[in-house]
């Protein structure tokens, strides 16, 4: 067997293992969803943010992509944060007098959602009639079969790939085959720092793959935007993807600010005129040919309804076919115009399989948030590219895996992690951070980044109060702060610690002074790894009139909800307090890295030191803080 065959065999074996682990996760999630749907009461579904009930049904219409959509709005429980987002499948149901749920025999897709209103794509007119005629209507998330189907398809294609670029990339990423580089000079970027400049150059020189490793606050997005901008001097168009819609929005907005024409496939999570202006749907309906296309589509629908009434069917069919041909012509013309104007096509990894991108190939694919994406999801987009640039931080949040066996088997090990280990020459570590006071940053740097990070001079000593200690640990071990288990999804709660957290925040606000806080818009975040604690903290803040003037400056969320964000002041409630030193979820140190690196100027950690310091990470963190 020659060397090339050995590379291929090893790569295929690894991908087949991925396929097996992904199948385990798929079966587990599908079964869990089935059990939830059958056994879980509607109240619990609402609390988890996966269900709205009761619903008001608003207007229905055909959108610019000729999809029948309907607007629905939740009437109650508006304070509960939901998990609906663009592209997710949903199902509708009614509740009868004895509180049994009856599901409609169709699934729909979220087209757009904000806090309380959702636009849903329906499969047809009969589905619309069903929900318009229903009493006591609700909607809930449905199992996302499509994402899994696309991941399995992508893995299958990569495993079978032979004598093409996809096969080469597979063997480079998973084998010992060396990467190649272009031989041209080093380009200076005086507006970037040295490690950012080096990262952009590494991206430009890479023929196969490059990695931009961006620890917290190091300007990963700035670097990535610069790398994309430079790539566009050599390539007409690139594909930019991320795992989440929010990350796609963020990078798209920064590219638009830089003057790059972006076409965003899918709908943004935050809706404003700037964001909407570069979405595919908005651009499609703004095209000069769209009014004519809309008229033709309406004429086709009218002719179909005449056809059902038994008019001259042959004549109508000919008219419909002729109009359909004309509509297809116009759609192709509009699409060609939109794609020829765009320099960047931006979408989620799953959306890169959208039919409107079918057959398209790109010289370069950029994947942001790559350390949060399952490897199989990355391959969905990689199939379209000749070279791949991954950006992210594998020392922060990993992909979400629900099946413990799949996680133990390594499903949470991302493509980015594998390339960092196998191909260290492709990695650029960004080393200067622009977010935190140096004392907040230093522990994370030592533990996660081999002490290689440094603070920019402008943030090194930043603080709100003179002679303030930037990071403190409030030890709750002798304060009757006891944890309680409240169920699988919500984890644990520590009510006494939450009350203490509120008191610590009040004390710090009073130290700063309310007027100064409002004048300077000093903002606060409260983080807990547990949903139950987050919800309890939100309730306490909502009920307490002390916080009324500052509510717009406060955010309370889980660690996952804070990824990519920062605040002037952060309080972390660690919750766990028990004699056995059991810390469960807190064993995932990547999550804690996210939590402790959100604060710019003040970090207050609340936790039971006797429980937590049984773990070496928390012991070291506790000692570090006490030595300051």
Task: List each language-model region with its residue ranges.
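Short, conserved secondary-structure segments in the cores of folded domains
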Residues: 80, 109, 335, 557-558
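Residue-level recognition of conserved beta-strand edge/terminus positions
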Residues: 92-94, 348, 573
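A helicase ATPase "motif cassette" and its flanking acidic/Ser/Thr-rich regulatory loops
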Residues: 1-86, 118, 147
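Conserved helicase motor core of SF1/SF2 NTP-dependent helicases
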Residues: 234-236, 244, 336, 350-628
